[in-house]
Amino acid sequence: MTDTRQDPIDSLVVADFGRGISRAYLLESISGGFRFVAKAEHRTTTDLPYEDMSQGWYNLLRQLEWSSGRGLTVRDKLAMPQLASGDGVDGLLISASFGEPIRVAILEAGQSAVAGPVLDALRRVHTRVFHASAPSSRKDGGWAATQADALRSFQPEMALLIIGAGAQDAMPRLLQLAKQVGMIGTVSRAIVIADGQAQEQGVAALGNKLKVRSISPVVRAPADIAGEIERELGEGFQIRLRTSDFEVIADDAIQAPISRAHAVDLVNRFIARAFKRQVLTIGVDDGAHAHWASGDQGAISALPQVDLTTAITGLTSREVSDATCWLPFESTEDELVTWALNRSIRPWTIAEQPRDLAIEQALARQVARRAVSEIGRTQPMALAGVDLVIGGPVFARWNQPGAAALALLDSIDIVPNNGVVDLALDPDGLMAVAGVVGTIDPTLASSLFEYDALTHLGSAIVIGGATSPGDVACRGEIHFDNGEMAQFSVLSGSVEVVPLKSGESATIVLRPERKFSIGGHPAGKTVTLAEERRIVGGTVGVIIDARPRTLAGNANRAMQVRQWLESVNGIRASTAVRKQS
């Protein structure tokens, strides 16, 4: 690797290599801030007919040169450091998600403080996880056989046995499954995290064909154990990236590449700390990942086996069937399955026709909902506290801010504790870029994020409760800074958008009907959003959402979805008309 770091760094190229699409970003210090200057995007050329990633990389560099009007390369390599003429850059940083994820099986028995930190660590590196917890009930006699079949299908490369307190009744099943691990043939190494006799039994069950080591949770802290496993898998990720064509590129980088999901997670946690927000970021790009953070706490859900491109076939039949509930027209599960199979054959096709856009948006909801549900499973109280939801580039590529806002709302599908959630997009994927930059200079990353990263869509006020569709759910009024005001009403089962432009702020008074409530407030209680809870405008405006929080369809479901989309996309006129108060 090339150490091109200077003090200060005035310019960088950050490369983000994906399975199908790669991007390059030119960043530069401008007027005291570190800014996003240009972006290039091109197919990752690892597959036929090229089978050489450097071909796509050269194309990205040429795009950046054309966009920025400056020379960045010498003989198809980045010119570093930056010259006095302004040509070249001071360094190269890389994030990547194109390698196959490492498949890890976690077999657990009893209660261990190690399990949670280890699972969090695995989500920060490029892995797929098979997690099985052995039951202690005598009625689960077929558990080991069922899990063994699933394990053979998963074909793990690494196994972790975690044995905690109270594991006596579950141990026979765990050991039976551990013996199968040793016989699968794909596992090369294993770690037994246990103490005393349980540790000895776990090592013996895995057999002598594997490279097995043991760690005592009594001697070492859970965070220390998780950190060691994360480092080991991170090194495995680096090895998996070391193809000859990629090494030619990576040798010029300041440091080793990091995974895209980890880079985004670093920025998600920064937002929570710096702006005192409870934030959820959702990405559907080379797999799905959701990131939650609040204060110093955080969680990540990484699902590299499902997305909207090559891994669209990772959707279950139930998820595809449920996707029909998000369509503004009648369709069947078979039609969506056919669409998904066609997408898997042509994974980099851009949806342009209204029908294709609607189907992609519906399936994006299902992918996102699975990733978000993993956060809800590991952090049961987290989602209700979220006050900021950020969507990745896939939500922005539809060029329909209203549809993107609605998709984000449907992905979390909760009534937030305070009734309000802000919605934003990361249209250019700059959260991953800022995360990579932050590993060498947090100040530069902070500047990049605050100036260029997010597009604010607006705020959504979610009304809880339900009656017959068409009944009034809430009445209210919005008071603008310029003295104007508007009154509005929202019907049960509908969405209303109150115009509030970017840069504007307003006070909103909400008067829900007696069977409806705003957040955690009692049903029928008037709520005023003012001062620190004042609403700030965005690209879409203020969304008042009085829809039921359920996927249950009805005969008029497609018509309802069409009306929702027309409201958020500005096709259906708002009932709120601004006038002088």
Could you tell me what each predicted segment is?
Residues 40-68, 136-143, 166-167, 314-316:
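N-terminal phosphate-binding loop and adjacent alpha-helix
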Residues 1-10, 77-97, 135-154, 179, ...:
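Conserved phosphate-binding catalytic cores of ATP/NTP-utilizing and phosphoryl-transfer enzymes
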Residues 19-52, 124-128, 298-313:
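Short glycine-rich, Thr/Ser-proximal phosphate-binding strand/loop in the N-terminal lobe
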Residues 192-227:
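Terminal amphipathic helices with adjacent charged low-complexity linkers/tails
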Residues 3-32, 102-107, 122, 148-166, ...:
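Gly/Thr-rich phosphate-binding beta-strand-loop-beta motif of the actin/hexokinase/Hsp70
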Residues 63-85, 151, 182-186, 271-272, ...:
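Phosphate/pyrophosphate-binding loops at sites that engage ATP/ADP/AMP, CoA/4′-phosphopantetheine
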Residues 75-115, 395-399:
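Short beta-strand-loop/turn "lid" adjacent to the catalytic site in phosphate-handling enzymes
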